[in-house]
Amino acid sequence: QYCQERFIELVPNLNSFGHFERWLRHKPYKQLAECPEGFRRDDPFMVRDHGSVLKPNQNSLDFIDSLYDEYLPHFSSKKFNVGLDEPWELGQGWSKPKVEKHGKHKVYLKHLEGILSLVEKHDKSMEFWADVILENPENAQHLPSHASPIIWGYEGDHPFSSQAKSVAECGLNFSLAPGTANWRSFSGRWETVRKNLHSACTNADEYGAEGILLTTWGDCGNHQPWSTMYPPLFLGSQLTWRGKDVNDEKIGTFIDRTVFHSPALGLGQALIDLAKLDQIIGFNLPNNSLPWFALFSAQPEKLPQHLAEQLSVHELQNGLDWLNKISSENFSSENNPNAKLAELEWKLGIDLSIAGINHAICMISKGINSSKIANNQPPLKKRFQDIWLQRARIGGLHEALSLLEKALQN
């Protein structure tokens, strides 16, 4: 109802193959998993004691269909995004003989056709993430004409051009999905999001995409402050509707005027300045900001060497100096609750980033007492919790807090 009143089409989205771990970790559903006892993979590195992918069989389709029966009546949109991305362990467990005989992509495509039949039974048109199909672009030729792939990519150099060309040549309706680049980050990644959005919008126009789906995610706990999404959201709006880039100052003013109803506030520009942190440090790792990576790396035993090979203490200190400089900004937000909350989020992003950089310095330097630095940090966990509850439901908070607490203790 909220969306309908604002002329927004709310498209249902339900993972229907991979990213199903929140079901498959529980005993009643374990038998549906490709690898019920868990799996390991190297790229990207992950070790799990439960599955994340459904078996590509009829039992899984029947279960998914039962979820569609419950879920889809709540949406008026004729579109339905079924996910189907990143089936990490496909071919490692139940489907291994099939994958060895026919290949992963044929097994995947057959299961996709089963999902498509369920979607059409519910009188919806299917959208799905295109990453598996694009592992071999020729696969696009084998897609049903009424399935709509969404080509996603979140870095500045993502090959939207070649991927969009491959799908467009098959006559399929498709969309391009850049990202806000603020997940796995406390600050956002402004240089990355500028390049990523510009590339996506340019290639969407050139190859006749149906549109742009600007995505934001919550990988590993949604630790990014909510307001770090504003600069990418406004830049994306500008590029998709106007097709012309604008400078940072104008984006900042748009945010101040539209979100905070105070054109001279300065908080919009401050959010952009925070998002320049990785650029100031000279750090560029896909899908990561340096402070977040230092605290949450999936392979902490390799982290000191990895950081030492990429960065110097001097470069990390440049990041701290930048954060100290921008944190001195003051805003007249006392009588503006929306701006006040965003300012609290901005300050939390700064302090979480400082904690991450200090941790990185400790790992690559000798003679620095990490416990002393940790003890000097403000009560980040409590602030994170308080701000979360001002924005969001309690669901997910315990998991996010547990991960954050563990990262800060380490």
Where does each model-flagged region fall?
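Aromatic- and acidic-residue-enriched carbohydrate-binding clefts of CAZyme catalytic domains
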Residues: Q1-E9, F20-D62, P73-S76, E86-K110
